[in-house]
């Protein structure tokens, strides 16, 4: 038995928010993650009253918020864009704290192999600022794994001297995108994992990778979950389903799959 909690990505249901909240509870989720980068959940579109109303809806269904998704789709590799992206990211973190979670997941762009290159330094500067702000709120910007091997990301994070920028661990992304070992990657990033996505996938050639239901891909779940337990992780495995025609069914099956592994 493992101490993990099961979450669901609210947007994966592809339904209006109230209906998606109902489904999240019905399938057996304990928590949820929701995109906060656009639409009605973006910080600029949510008054304090609306934020409280949303949180009340979450709690009334027996759920909590595991994290917000704050991926703005551009990374932090362009010094001309970074000031605006950093400012918006801070507002999303403010929203997260008001919604009683301390994690905002994001993508920063692919960490270069060469620590001496300009892009590496640009990303460092952006992440230093994000980390400092997150530390002030006792919160985390959590970088999603996948664009680079786990060890390279760990080395980058070590240069920041902070857990304000931490990790949202996605085993499928590592497996599909860079052919990394999901279990070994957990040990490489053990100091930084604050949230995880539960997703599975297979490497291939056409297309280069494909998402599949949990347990049907290349993620070795028993080894992966054991590794998370061994590093002391006690947080959320948040189910993210980005494709397929029957998201509710797929998410419910994923909940059952995880329950069978951790209960």
Model-inferred region functions:
Residues 217-219, 223-224, 229, 235-237:
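H/E-rich (His + Asp/Glu) clusters that bind or coordinate divalent metals
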Residues 2, 6-8, 31, 68, ...:
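Acidic/histidine-rich catalytic cores of soluble enzymes
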Residues 32-33, 66, 104, 196, ...:
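Hydrophobic residues within beta-strands of alpha/beta enzymes
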Residues 45-53, 80-88, 115-125, 148, ...:
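Alpha-helix N-cap and loop-to-helix initiation/capping positions
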Residues 16-22, 57-60, 74-167, 176, ...:
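Active-site acidic/histidine proton-transfer and metal-coordination neighborhood
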Residues 13, 238-247:
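A short, acidic, flexible beta-alpha connecting loop/helix-capping segment that sits on the rim
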Residues 36, 108, 200, 241:
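Short secondary-structure boundary segments
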């Amino acid at each position: 038995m493992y101490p993990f909690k099961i979450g669901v990505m609210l947007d994966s249901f592809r339904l209006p928010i109230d209906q998606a909240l109902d489904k999240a509870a019905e399938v057996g989720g304990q928590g949820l993650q929701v995109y906060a980068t656009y639409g009605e959940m973006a910080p600029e579109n949510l008054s304090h009253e609306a934020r409280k109303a949303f949180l009340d809806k979450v709690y009334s269904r027996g759920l909590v918020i595991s994290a917000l998704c704050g991926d703005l789709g551009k990374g932090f590799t362009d010094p001309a864009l970074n000031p605006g992206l950093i400012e918006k990211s801070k507002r999303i973190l403010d929203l997260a704290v008001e919604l009683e979670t301390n994690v905002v997941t994001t993508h920063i762009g692919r960490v270069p192999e060469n620590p001496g290159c300009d892009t590496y330094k640009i990303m460092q500067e952006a992440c230093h600022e994000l980390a400092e702000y997150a530390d002030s709120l006792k919160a985390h910007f959590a970088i999603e794994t996948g664009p680079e091997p786990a060890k390279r990301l760990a080395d980058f994070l070590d240069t920041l001297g902070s857990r304000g920028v931490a990790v949202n661990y996605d085993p499928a992304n590592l497996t599909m995108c860079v052919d990394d070992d999901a279990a070994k990657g957990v040990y490489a990033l053990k100091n930084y994992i604050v949230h995880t996505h539960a997703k599975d996938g297979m490497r291939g050639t056409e297309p280069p990778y494909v998402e599949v239901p949990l347990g049907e891909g290349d993620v070795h779940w028993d080894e992966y979950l054991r590794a998370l337990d061994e590093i002391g992780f006690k947080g959320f495995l948040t189910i993210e389903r980005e494709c397929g025609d029957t998201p509710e069914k797929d998410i419910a099956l994923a909940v059952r799959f995880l329950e069978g592994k951790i209960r």
